[in-house]
Amino acid sequence: MRAARALAALGAAFVLLYAGFVLGQQSAPTDYKLVSEDVLAAIDLAKEIDSVRGRELRLSSAVIAPDGHVGLHSHRGDPTIVYMLSGVLTNHHDDGTTEEFHAGEAFAEYGPRSHWVENRGSAPARFIVANIHHQ
């Protein structure tokens, strides 16, 4: 009888301890709280690529030194979004238009239009590049 009571008391203590542990656990939230999001640039991928086979989603950091450039190219089949971290990047399109992008700004390049970029400034142009790249 004494052993049965001791076993019952031990079992009850275990249940209470386990229940306290379980109740003390915080479950993961399923909502968003105190979050803001601004879409800086977007590309409709269905219009740009037929299949993701042989592709990878890539996020890169890049720097163009003062007086540096990336030569004329297009992003047909390689849609790309650029987010400027610092410096200034001048973007030249094949239609003759030119745009300057500064820290905190973003731009998208896609489709058959060609462009080239240069750093006309005195500081490095630092930026993040996200693209769907051919492997």
Stretches found by the model and what they are:
Residues 52-55, 68-80:
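A short beta-loop-beta micro-motif enriched in histidine and acidic residues
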Residues 59-61, 81, 106-108, 129:
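Conserved hydrophobic/aromatic beta-strand scaffold that supports enzyme active sites
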Residues 112-135:
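Ligand-binding loop in jelly-roll beta-barrel domains
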Residues 64-65, 95-112:
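Short acidic-glycine-tyrosine-enriched beta hairpin
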Residues 49, 70-75, 93, 118-120:
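Short histidine-centered beta-strand/loop micro-motifs
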Residues 75-95, 105:
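Glycine- and acidic-residue-biased ligand/ion/polar-headgroup-sensing regions
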Residues 69-71, 90, 107, 111-118:
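Histidine-centered metal-chelating micro-motifs
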Residues 3-7, 12-58, 92, 100, ...:
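A short, N-terminal "cap"/entry segment at the start of jelly-roll beta-barrel domains
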